Amino acid sequence: QDNVTCAGVWLTQSLNQWSEFRASVRCLFVCWLAVLVGSWVVYVEYSSYSELCRGRQCTAAMCAKYRKGLVDGSACSSLCDKDTLELDKCLSTHAAKQVYSGMWGDLEGVVRCRMDEAPAYDVGSQMEAGKEAAALFDTPPTGTSVEKFREMILDHLKAKVDEEQANLGELTARALAAADANKDGRISLAEARSSWALLQLNDFLLALALQERGHTPKILGFCGDLYVTEKVPNAPLYGVRAPAWTPAWVRRAADHWFTPAWHHRAKISMGLLELVEDLFHGAFGSFLMCDLSAAHFGYTGRYDFRVADAQNIVPQATFQEAIRQQRCDRDTDCVYGVDCLTSCDLTKRRCTPEVAEPNLVKACRVLEDYVLQGAPSDIREELEKQLYACMALRGSAEQAEIQHSLVLNNLKTLLWKKISHNKDS
């Protein structure tokens, strides 16, 4: 009996030890898996950061051009000599378009710098990119008069905008005023070359065209085709700026948790509708919004709508010229940016120039999720009706101009009636 008891005790102890061993192995496996996943996340984030965030290289290249006398501007001295314009957090989403938050003295701003896409290991591409970069700052040529430069700008804007009713004379005057960076009443060759390079950028052109409307951040200064704008205090439009690897359901939940109160969202929504109105046959031509992702928009502390990133808002004429050259086999081949779609002409195998959806339709699709949720019960039904009528619009805005304007005004009136009594509206 004692032997049986001893055997039972030994067996029990062995089983306990085996259970403890299995638990230890399981714990070690979980820890190893956590380290592996954590390392993968760190690697992905670092790889993404090192590829996307090359602001130091971009500013160093611009300062080299400044010291050679190729470029000039109100930000050059602060960036290259005094070190009072500093880059902070990387906001880039594309390697060729460096975007950083930064400080310029006491001012918070956003620094944008264009960079060649050629990989560092591709020597041939680097040489070609170098030639293109040098050529970019060769215009206008030495000896160009201010009057000739004015004509060059006007011709460039005509090609970009291509609308008879656009006030291109006023836009040309604004471009010349911006070129005189030190406000001495003269435009140096380096200043002219810098402003010419900036005018090739759609986002800079839009900021110049809408500088009095308040929808785009104010331009604070430039150096070559690097330029600084005011920082939009709250961006993205809703939610938080989550890493790309965050699950979609987490991002969507955050979008709803971190949105402002409804009457503030209504005011922001009115700002978006006013921007759509300004971009449709505005004083300086028509522009198309080719990516209405929430990350590209934001708002101020007073809940005034702002465009945080205008790189995907393009002049309609520029869009039409680019899309006409695009070969296609089906309609899905005819996409510019993210959501500027046209149809495919199968007889020519070319994309047609007319967009399938006007800006207003895409804006209403954003507002359906943004302003309809939590809307007061007394206007929710009518608001939903107007938003659905808006999203049902088809064809370009020119083809249904009256209906386009009617839907836009109905939405603005409905929102304004509800929020006009609020002191911060």
What residue ranges belong to the model's regions?
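Catalytic activation segment of kinase domains across protein kinase-like and atypical kinase folds
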Residues: 240, 284-358
